[in-house]
Amino acid sequence: MHRILNIAGNEKNKDDLIEQPAADFIFITSVKADLNLISNLLLEKEFASLKNNIRALEISNLNSSAQIDNYLLKTINYAKVVVLRIFGDKGTWNYGIEQLLNWQAVNKKRKLVILSGTVDQEVSLSEISSIDKNIALNISRLLRSGGMENYRKFLNCLNYLKVNETLIPDEFLNISFYPDPYLYDWKIEKGEKIGIISYKSLFLANEIEVNEKLNLQLR
């Protein structure tokens, strides 16, 4: 069975062959929250030109060699920049990484960016990217810090990656840090004060729907 999607999360996929429309940018990730953040940002006018030129996919949709080969043939072969973000070492998705390295080797104008979701693997993964290792490390840390603003910066980096990563402005590589605790949707209002305590990680992943509904009811 084939499924054609723009942004694909894990839908208990085991055997489906995933393909997506051709685009300049491909983002493959181990982290479902990445897809949530990017999907929301692509709704903004700032990324109108990118909206139909990026495909995102949860790595769990590419479990077998058949799925990886099919996605490479039908989608990745038409891309100019592929960003892979994984939790684990090179062996976590060994066949997939091997095929991406082969894809990039065929055409040196293609850009492959491999990012780590953890600190301990960030150097070993960034150094096999086809771009400058330090820039790959910087982008890796940007995404690991989380939050809409850091993902906004990541999306702004993409067009520069396509041409020359050394042209990326510092403003898009500087991490935005969020205070802890972070006051989300806190307003100076009349009446009794009620605070909802939630995990900061949910805010950084933009999983705020429950909190917004609670705030609406309390107000």
Language model feature labels by segment:
Residues 1-219:
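An N-terminal assembly and electron-transfer interface module characteristic of large anaerobic redox
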